[in-house]
Amino acid sequence: MARREIGIKKRGTSKRKLKPVYLIIAEGKNKTEVLYLSHFQDQEKNYSIRFVKAGHKTDADSLYNALVDKWEELDLSEKKGDRGFVILDIDNDPLKAQKVLALAQSNTNTAVSFVVSNPTFEVWFLLHFKYTTKQYKDGNAVIKELRRYLPNYEKNRDCFEDCKDETKEAVKNSIMLAEYYVDCEWPSIECNPRTDVGVLIACLEGEEEIRHY
């Protein structure tokens, strides 16, 4: 009988499945984004979503660095189809917008994309029900408008089922908004409202490649 080799398996050296890994990180104070995007973790998808814990610091630098650290820990590679997505709100804050823009421009990993919303992620939900170029003072103003269609909407509430039938409409509306602001720098507070979530969803559905800034 052939002798079987027995050895110690080192951490990080095991072969992972061939499915590409999509790393996603979002601001830690809200579970809204994670709750929504977790519905795209379909076993039949040709990728696997992994959420990265944001920790207490939710500024753009901290989110980006946390995702890059996890990327390196998992030994991910663009050549294998792995992707990273940093989901951010700029809250009509010019300093936040400038920080995200600078970070995106200095990012050397072309597999990592920034998914930005202004004022907040809720713009994406609102676009399921209407196309609008109306400007919003802040995230609360967006939520107030959203409650016309989802009266029970609250932060950290899973509203995927309430929106899923209009996802294609929301993608179309988000692309129309991007075209509306085509002459404006992005991210910037001039683009209000605007969100990249539609492009991310199209990417997750295999319909469109997400762009880079």
How would you describe each model-predicted region?
Residues 2-22, 31-54, 68-85, 90-213:
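C-terminal accessory helical subdomains adjacent to catalytic cores in phosphodiester-
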Residues 27:
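Short, glycine-rich nucleotide/cofactor-binding loops
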Residues 59-67:
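Eukaryotic endosomal/vacuolar membrane-trafficking regulators centered on PX-domain-mediated PI3P pathways
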